[in-house]
Amino acid sequence: VVPGYPANKPEQPVIRVSYNDAMEYCKILSQKTGLNITLPTEAQWEWACRGGSDEDFWFGNLNADFGKKDNLADVTTNKFAVSGVDPQPMSPESPWYKYYTFLPKAANVDDGSLVQVGGKKYEANPFGLYCMHGNVAEWTRSDYVPYPYKENPKKVSEYKVVRGGSYIERPKYSTAYSRKGFY
């Protein structure tokens, strides 16, 4: 019996890491390598994500088919409608199906992934980076303050900017410019 969906396989991205833990990991890597390693700023992250594009995604606009490009909410999320102990997709004929397929999604796309995956399942952007849109959200070291903000704002936020969206978010929340605040 599988106790749930896989989330910690070696090829999957690290999840459920606090901002402080991510920064501590960067500090350890810096000490081991002699390089100055840190999380990117919000601007650095967006530049890397775009891969030279000025569109919503590195591969096109909001209506672009992301199926081979990135892991976002799509028809595969219907498989979250499960029954039994071993999570098996619920049949669409089940009277309960409509109550378990409520997640907003891009109904015309199937990227083939239910949860977060190793990046190389999808195409890399022109800079060679995988899954910058969707899959898992990524910390930046920027404070979450309203736009436009100054280079060194006086008010510091306890929230940090995360970018990239996740496997369960619709495309409009995973664009190169979408941002959220977490602490």
Walk through the language-model features, giving the residues of each.
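Functional-site microenvironments in short loops/helix caps that host divalent-cation chemistry
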Residues: 2-180
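Histidine-anchored, small-residue-rich loop motif
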Residues: 183
